[in-house]
Amino acid sequence: MSLAIRAAGAADHDAIWAALEPVIRAGETYALPRDWSRETALAYWFAPAHEVFVAGETLGTYFLQANQQGGGAHVANCGYITSLAATGRGVARAMCAHSLERARERGFRAMQFNLVVATNTRAVALWQTMGFAITGTLPGAFAHPTLGDVDAHVMYRRL
C-alpha cells in the first residue's frame, strides 16, 4: 500500500483521538487504562520522547522513541494504532515500514516491541512478516477484559 505518512501535530489531535479512543476503551491490545481521558491519552501519545506520525487521512498513527536510555538507547520502540475503519487495508504494514526506515535514519540499530498481546494474532503475524521475532513470552502478563490473563510477547529485530 502506498500511503502518505507525515509528522503529526496539534491539528491532528481530534483525528488521532478518534483512532485511539476505541482501542483504549476496548482494552484488548494496549496496556493503557481503559478510562483515560482524551487529554491524558493525547499527552501519552505525544510524550516529549515520542516522534509521532499519521498515515493518510489519519487512517492510523504511530510513535517512535528510544526503548531505553543509556546502554539501551540504540534500540527503538514504537506504538501503532490503525483506525477501526482502516483495519485490514495495509495501514499498519505501511506504518511499520515507515518506522523502520525512520528508526534507521535516527541511528537506531534495532527495534523492540515490549508487550505484544498474544491474542492479537493479526499483529503478531504482521510483525513477524516485517522481520520481528518473538524473543520472549511473558505468561499471563496482559489482563484481557474478556479472556482474563493472557500471554504477551517481546518482539525484536535488528535494523
Residue locations for each model-derived region?
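Conserved GNAT acetyl-CoA-binding A-motif
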Residues: A103-V116
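Acetyl-CoA-dependent GNAT
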Residues: A26-T29, P33-A85, C96-H98, R102, ...
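Conserved beta-strand-loop-alpha-helix junction that forms the acyl-donor binding cleft
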Residues: F113-A123, A141-A143
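A short beta-loop-alpha structural element at the N-terminal edge
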Residues: A4-I16
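Conserved acetyl-CoA-binding loop-helix of GNAT-fold acetyltransferases
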Residues: G88-E105, V124-T129
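Conserved acetyl-CoA-binding loop of GNAT-fold acetyltransferases
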Residues: Q128-T137
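Terminal substrate-recognition subdomain of acyl/acetyltransferases
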Residues: S2, Y80-I81, L115, H144-L159
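Active-site acidic-Proline motif in GNAT/NAT acetyltransferases
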Residues: Y80-A85, R89, V117-T119
